[in-house]
Amino acid sequence: MHSLSQRANTIVCFGGIVLVGVLLLNVLSRAFFSDHVDVDIKLNEIHRFNTQRNFEYSFISIDLDANLEPLFNWNTKMLFLYVTAEYRTKQNVLSQVVVWDHILTEKSKANIHEKRLSKYPIINQGLGLKNNTIKLTFNYNVVPISGILTRHQVGTSEFKFPTTYMKEAY
């Protein structure tokens, strides 16, 4: 006859093995879900482009069309979406600035057709944005219930800053 502690140990160990097995199947099932989405991103407007002392700042708005519904499955907890602006200057080899971000938790809201999205300014330490090419990139992280967080980049667009500073829309 086994004691109560031996029986409890057997049950806990068996439960742990079953849990690890289910989590392993969950991680392996990730290979069957597509991570590809079509995204269209473009500059809508440069609202302000100015300088103060030794830094430049700009407010831009973007247009975004994306259908992210294929990314939602039984293992998707949420999507972290963000748009980066990348540029190069003489002082910096590569600068990346987040200009918009959003956390998406529902599949019903995963079809995005937004105009004039604007959240964060582009701030460049130093002077080098005039007539500089900026690359907008849509990025997303798939945050699973269990498994590895994955990062993806899709949809890019480029635009040039004006050759002069401005306070009004360009």
From Swiss-Prot:
Secretion signal, residue range per the UniProt entry: none
Per the record, ranges on the Cytoplasmic side are 1-7
**Residue intervals annotated with topology Lumenal:** 29-170
Which superkingdom is the protein from? Eukaryota
A GO BP entry is: signal peptide processing
Among InterPro entries, the record links this protein to:
SPC3
Q: Does the keyword Transmembrane helix apply?
A: yes
Annotated compartments = Endoplasmic reticulum membrane
Q: How does it sit in the membrane?
A: Single-pass type II membrane protein
The GO cellular component terms are: signal peptidase complex
User: At which residues is glycosylation annotated?
Assistant: 131
Per the UniProt record, which residue ranges are transmembrane?
8-28
Disulfide bond entries: none
Q: What is its main location?
A: endoplasmic reticulum
Keywords, comma-separated and alphabetical: Endoplasmic reticulum, Glycoprotein, Membrane, Signal-anchor, Transmembrane, Transmembrane helix
Subunit info? Component of the signal peptidase complex (SPC) composed of a catalytic subunit sec11 and three accessory subunits spcs1, spcs2 and spcs3. The complex induces a local thinning of the ER membrane which is used to measure the length of the signal peptide (SP) h-region of protein substrates. This ensures the selectivity of the complex towards h-regions shorter than 18-20 amino acids.
Known role: Essential component of the signal peptidase complex (SPC) which catalyzes the cleavage of N-terminal signal sequences from nascent proteins as they are translocated into the lumen of the endoplasmic reticulum. Essential for the SPC catalytic activity, possibly by stabilizing and positioning the active center of the complex close to the lumenal surface.
Family listed? Belongs to the SPCS3 family.
- Please identify the protein, giving its name as recorded: Signal peptidase complex subunit 3
